[in-house]
């Protein structure tokens, strides 16, 4: 099984990296961009056959290490 995890800043948290990318895109001539938010994508190859157990384990990984839940949200997708 594979776990795909998207970690993003919570909407209320300022994103200086996103602002820098937005500014750079404007400098390169890309206009009409309202906002850029930057995050992380993590893919984990799991040695697990039970989808519910995999979801539970990855949820714990996110809470304990992969995401700073004070300022970040995360979304998990489990695939076989």
Residue ranges and their predicted role:
Residues 1-11, 42-43:
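Short glycine-/aliphatic-rich beta-strand segments at the starts of folded cytosolic domains
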Residues 6, 36, 45, 77-79:
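Solvent-exposed beta-strand sheet faces enriched in polar/charged residues
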Residues 14-16, 49-56:
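Short, conserved charged micro-motifs
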Residues 31-37:
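N-terminal glycine-rich anion-binding loops that anchor highly charged ligand groups
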Residues 39-45, 49:
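Short, charge-patterned binding micro-sites
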């Amino acid at each position: 099984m594979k776990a795909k995890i998207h970690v993003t800043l919570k909407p209320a948290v300022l994103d200086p990296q996103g602002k820098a990318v937005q500014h750079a895109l404007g400098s390169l001539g890309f206009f009409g961009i309202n906002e850029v938010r930057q995050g992380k994508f993590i893919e984990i190859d799991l040695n697990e056959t039970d989808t519910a157990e995999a979801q539970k384990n990855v949820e714990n990984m996110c809470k304990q290490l992969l995401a700073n839940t004070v300022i970040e949200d995360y979304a998990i997708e489990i695939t076989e």
